[in-house]
Amino acid sequence: MDLMHRTLLTALGALSVVYALVKFSLGYWKRRGILHEKPKFLWGNIKGVVSGKRHAQDALQDIYTAYKGRAPFVGFYACLKPFILALDLKLVHQIIFTDAGHFTSRGLYSNPSGEPLSHNLLQLDGHKWRSLHAKSAEVFTPANMQKLLVRLSQISSRIQRDLGEKSLQTINISELVGAYNTDVMASMAFGLVGQDNVEFAKWTRNYWADFRMWQAYLALEFPLIARLLQYKSYAEPATAYFQKVALSQLQLHRRRDRQPLQTFLQLYSNAEKPLTDIEIAGQAFGFVLAGLGPLNATLAFCLYELARQPEVQDRTRLEINKALEEHGGQVTPECLRELRYTKQVLNETLRLHTPHPFLLRRATKEFEVPGSVFVIAKGNNVLIPTAAIHMDPGIYENPQRFYPERFEEQARRSRPAAAFLPFGDGLRGCIAARFAEQQLLVGLVALLRQHRYAPSAETSIPVEYDNRRLLLMPKSDIKLSVERVDKL
């Protein structure tokens, strides 16, 4: 009886301590006197997100809508972790551009010693990130992007081969654009061709195989413990494959040092400030990590929207074929520069279906919000709700409408720079954004130059997002009717 009594008292004591710690964690914003969304016990303000019943963007959109205009930012909780949600575009501009030196960290988990491929620009912070960023800057130059365009155009010809003479057939658009982007990643990042791409495609589908939202959250909340326990962000067989391929391709490149520049491995290896081989492998993996899913979703969503607006699709195709005709049928830098309306179509897709619904920053030093009494403390995690900004009716009239004219030069200049951030921007923006845009444009040229798309009986309207993903990805594959057409 005494043992049972002591056990019960111990259990109650432990529960009391846990309860007190949870209440203390969820009282952070109240203690600081900061406007905040009242949290629920344990879940904070993201109930249903971890379980996949609700998308993170829905939770952020609700907070943004409820508090915008009341303060420059609002506090909220992701489970027990306090976050700042930036509400005011002036504050967003300061965080991204003018005062980016106060927010040089993303606050993501990385463990280069235990997981070498996490040594990439996306995950690193501090001195390691600054050093790597400086070395990467000379790789992602306009001149190098131009050198890679020829190979990119060659890869896009697969789209035409896959589509062929198809006439009024329903095809899986998600698979089609996924094959193109995977070939780009395999070839441009790793230098793979032919049969090697098949195995590469398999591993690009499997590196998230062991991903669990709650494990990622714990690694974000307790990074030191995660490193001690050797927590892995990605499936080990997949990272072992990517590391092995990158290192073997680097050795192959050095034996063929007269080969024309066609891959990022070569560009990094030939840089004036070279990286170690394992660092180069990390960047190649980061290229896949940051780019493959968002680029697949963007091209699929773009065709989905064009299928629903045939007049916009026809205008885009007309511009593409006119530019190709003026440049001998070749996709050249000059040809891409002439695709002004096509770029507007892509930008409107990125606005309406923003792949990264939020940007993460962590304050590396205290920041006083100008013109207010508010202070963002060192160590505070800041979240910029890009998708909510892109869908704000105060910035974009009738935001649910797909309307490429929003990105005409005059309309674009009338909005603040922070009103459109599909790839992030500023100091910690996507360093490969220029190449990503080039990859999307070249893919869209190949998709539209000889084929027309329309909704079919298998097209899900409206499109739904996958609640299990942090990115805005389609819940199911996008399928459309396709037919070959003559030039308009």
UniProtKB/Swiss-Prot annotation:
One of its GO terms (molecular function) is oxidoreductase activity, acting on paired donors, with incorporation or reduction of molecular oxygen. The gene is Cyp6u1. PROSITE patterns: CYTOCHROME_P450. Its cofactor is heme. Keywords: Endoplasmic reticulum, Heme, Iron, Membrane, Metal-binding, Microsome, Monooxygenase, Oxidoreductase. It comes from Drosophila melanogaster (Fruit fly). Belongs to the cytochrome P450 family. The keyword Iron applies. Heme binds at C430. It is found in: Endoplasmic reticulum membrane; Microsome membrane. GO terms for cellular component: endoplasmic reticulum membrane. It is a peripheral membrane protein. May be involved in the metabolism of insect hormones and in the breakdown of synthetic insecticides. CDD domains: CYP6-like. It is an enzyme of class 1 (oxidoreductase). Its EC number is 1.14.-.-. This is Probable cytochrome P450 6u1.
